Amino acid sequence: MIPKTFIDYYGDETRWFLGEVVDVENDPKKLGRVKVKVFGVYDNIKDEDLPWAQIVVPITQGVHESKGQYLGLLEGTQVFGMFLDGKNSQLPMVIGTVPKEGDENPRAKANYPHNKIYQTKRGHYKEYDDTKDNERIREQHSSGTYYEIDKDGNMVIDATKSEPKIRNIEIKASGKITVTAPIVDINGSENVKINS
């Protein structure tokens, strides 16, 4: 028998749902909430009239004081969740995402399921590829500028839109250093020393 003090507990008459995220940016309380068009429940309700849904997050995700990581959801994501108020259906809580056809990331297809990709809606992304004999790490800006570390630990940095700028640099190598370019300029405002 359920004690009277628990009769109105949120878990009573749980109602599950499947829906699609339609708003991720306008939460007035800035709590990371989203609006979800719940299939079969909110079909005829305008997006602006939908209630804000809380999101269940992993314990490694920051929820205060900017600690932890925050990846967030994107509009168009299919989600699974429950209504905390049961049949009233006004307190939605998102528990997880459900992939649907068309959600495949084009960068992930070639090496699926060995690579993990984190991509923002603006096109910035990180990729960790565990494909055997082709392990690599890559981080890329939406402009195309990126750095990549291959399976042997070699690093490539490519700044497509600008020139990399470093305040101080020291280059040491156990072998040969080769500089190749149509024009090579070496300028020193005080001294240029070349020793052999």
Q: Language-model features: where?
A:
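C-terminal intramolecular chaperone/autoprocessing and neck/assembly modules of extracellular spikes
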Residues: 190-196
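Hydrophobic packing positions characteristic
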Residues: 1-189
